[in-house]
From Swiss-Prot:
Entry binding sites for Ca(2+): H143, D156, D158
Record PTM N6-acetyllysine, positions in chain: K401, K970
Known regulation of activity: Calcium ions and ADP stimulate, whereas ATP and NADH reduce catalytic activity.
EC class (word): oxidoreductase
Thermal behaviour (record text): Optimum temperature is 37 degrees Celsius. Activity decreases with increasing temperature.
Record's keyword terms, sorted: Acetylation, Calcium, Glycolysis, Isopeptide bond, Magnesium, Metal-binding, Mitochondrion, Nucleus, Oxidoreductase, Phosphoprotein, Thiamine pyrophosphate, Transit peptide, Ubl conjugation
Entry binding sites for Mg(2+): D411, N444, I446
Species of the source: Homo sapiens (Human)
EC number in record: 1.2.4.2
Protein name per UniProt: 2-oxoglutarate dehydrogenase complex component E1
Stated family: Belongs to the alpha-ketoglutarate dehydrogenase family.
Residues that bear Phosphoserine: S100
Amino acid sequence: MFHLRTCAAKLRPLTASQTVKTFSQNRPAAARTFQQIRCYSAPVAAEPFLSGTSSNYVEEMYCAWLENPKSVHKSWDIFFRNTNAGAPPGTAYQSPLPLSRGSLAAVAHAQSLVEAQPNVDKLVEDHLAVQSLIRAYQIRGHHVAQLDPLGILDADLDSSVPADIISSTDKLGFYGLDESDLDKVFHLPTTTFIGGQESALPLREIIRRLEMAYCQHIGVEFMFINDLEQCQWIRQKFETPGIMQFTNEEKRTLLARLVRSTRFEEFLQRKWSSEKRFGLEGCEVLIPALKTIIDKSSENGVDYVIMGMPHRGRLNVLANVIRKELEQIFCQFDSKLEAADEGSGDVKYHLGMYHRRINRVTDRNITLSLVANPSHLEAADPVVMGKTKAEQFYCGDTEGKKVMSILLHGDAAFAGQGIVYETFHLSDLPSYTTHGTVHVVVNNQIGFTTDPRMARSSPYPTDVARVVNAPIFHVNSDDPEAVMYVCKVAAEWRSTFHKDVVVDLVCYRRNGHNEMDEPMFTQPLMYKQIRKQKPVLQKYAELLVSQGVVNQPEYEEEISKYDKICEEAFARSKDEKILHIKHWLDSPWPGFFTLDGQPRSMSCPSTGLTEDILTHIGNVASSVPVENFTIHGGLSRILKTRGEMVKNRTVDWALAEYMAFGSLLKEGIHIRLSGQDVERGTFSHRHHVLHDQNVDKRTCIPMNHLWPNQAPYTVCNSSLSEYGVLGFELGFAMASPNALVLWEAQFGDFHNTAQCIIDQFICPGQAKWVRQNGIVLLLPHGMEGMGPEHSSARPERFLQMCNDDPDVLPDLKEANFDINQLYDCNWVVVNCSTPGNFFHVLRRQILLPFRKPLIIFTPKSLLRHPEARSSFDEMLPGTHFQRVIPEDGPAAQNPENVKRLLFCTGKVYYDLTRERKARDMVGQVAITRIEQLSPFPFDLLLKEVQKYPNAELAWCQEEHKNQGYYDYVKPRLRTTISRAKPVWYAGRDPAAAPATGNKKTHLTELQRLLDTAFDLDVFKNFS
């Protein structure tokens, strides 16, 4: 079978799916119609099936051959035997022997028999017509399904019924059939399951069953999937007669869940009628839908579900799916309660949650996590995916059988936000796949006030999912049983095929965008219909009462019981005196903090290493730890250079990174480095993945060969996405504090396409959601004449969002001042000028007793700069990250003679030292490097200023004046010295673009800033 699958894969073009016998009904084969015998005279290479144009037919023939080799022509029998033996398709096929003269006579006789049977052609045409009819329903039946609960809109935005869908007998002529054929019995093809145990049905019954399967309250989009097995699986789930049956107990459970969903919203409306809560009215069926997905997934072995969703219905999901204590939810409506935790907090419909409980349907433990998110719709999608991937990684769930994700979407956002597309394209990448996500779209057919026809160009809001061959199940939300069935199928699909699936809940929004909004301004006719619409709970209760499943008193008792639960929780909420944001934590780290959520210490050990460890890592970094592995000649030279550096006890940038990573792996810290081209490195400096030059796709990661029991190292080239991938890595870093998760931009300039993740999650995440995160951003930065899009990581933006006060000098005598600063800041911003300091800051990120995002402006030209080297001595035990690197030359020996103290950061230091040496001013100008910009090293800089009492102060940067670090550094330096001296500026003039694209202009600007930095008279006119 494997060989045939391989063969079929080679032959299969991207055609519409046909059939696979694996799922076909057990029924007698249809009577074969007579075919004209072919005289085989074409060469093997000309056989059309070898070109891949008939791959579906080949697979059907193969399935028939498996059941009975004699049921296919001898040539097929030989072909399949050869293929199973391992022969390639071209040699496996052997043409049948040419026909003899006697055989040709037999052909002529057979032809005369055909001519004597004029009805044969009609029979064949009728059967082909029926097959086309069935296929038309499978492909386009969803277009005429009754999906809108209001009955006024077409879910696909098309009011015309497709001409090739049979919904009335007058359209039979399209297929060459007529009304007289309705009672004629037709054999059913293997591509349908409408027959159940029957192999033939009258045309009238075929149409009726197809209408029931595809044109009622469920619309199924799946025929674009180019996998026969998957298509056949879906057909079986929706076409089999009587398959959508529920027991009375299941119906009562569904009713009870609808009661909870509906009465929760009504309770909030009664108690807080003027509060925004973004209620679920109009799609109350979402709660039982989610619970059904979770129930079925739990039954299939899932024990951890990570969810992401927008504001619509969030409180209801927290209450009735995740089972957050109701009193904690009600407390969020009390404006008098103050928050006990540090930080700004967030509105109630953004908060996340983590809860472990027993699933009552399966009686198994299940953990539910709802990720906190901002109002930026769909921004949490990749975050959820990353967290899911991490949880799967840490529990060894390589197939996604234990941990899964559910993403909820609004219809307008699902179609309108590009991050949805980016996230979908991560779904099947080896280093990013979560083995299938269940997407649930709350399709209330409106986006705030915008009509769907103005919100998307595609027929459905879900069409983006087609790019990854995810089946899409549209369902009318006013048919709760149809919704439950679709959700069961979605969970089963994900469990079976480990691929994404979409459930489109076509519903409506009973109120405005929020409870204070008036929708009649913009959608008057729609809301007139909504005002007349019975709630789904009332409809379903009436149905069950009429069926005798429940009686009216039982239904009313269920309502009273839940109302009582809400009232009792409301009473308890009045006893609460304070709000605890940490009760809403979506990603707890058990054992990392104390029980009250505080760090276990406020100190950081030395980040240095013994020389033996440094040497061992360096030796592995400069070798190929796999036998018979041929690397590129240019890479051999790079590894040789690394080996020489190790012998000389020095490191460059790439080797320093290698040593930081390797040492953390030894300590059991998982490291994940992701981004565009990170395996080699944009600047061809890293080479963490070696490629065999003689064996295709054979690779080696030396970092995973360092120690016997080391943690795994994951380095992965990402898709060409910043927004999606950075969100994914942020989510991965949320799962555990004991991992170093890094995202590297190809150039720092490109991080701004991920600005939403930076602004809404990384920068304020802890303040809003009491959630620490240790993600590291590596942003290549430096003005090197490469133009405005390859020069600046926009440090001014990161620094502007730092939360320290530039006008307040902190208590510099405080114990562990530097660690306390790190604990209080919202993120750490550094620009290292030496490989050794880069090594230390990476290790410090893990050795700190808490986690903060780390922004590193990394170099480009310094990667190979001969002066950008560090000695092993700077990395040995007892050494630390240097927040400030002071002047250590002649100027430091005679500080009273220093006329100017230049402060700078990053690469420009090397330009300054070169110019200072050329001007012979090493005794007159001192240069101090600020390596850690935020939190600002007030204490160390005060010492530097005091050391040079006669020096004027200047900040020098290569960036333009309105960019870079100047506006951040100047007020803090002034505060440090109590505004005793001015802080002058030496750098480029203000500009709109980050850099010039002209090399000559670049060099002119550089020389001008160097002239300013070393002209001791330049600032006298401004005094």
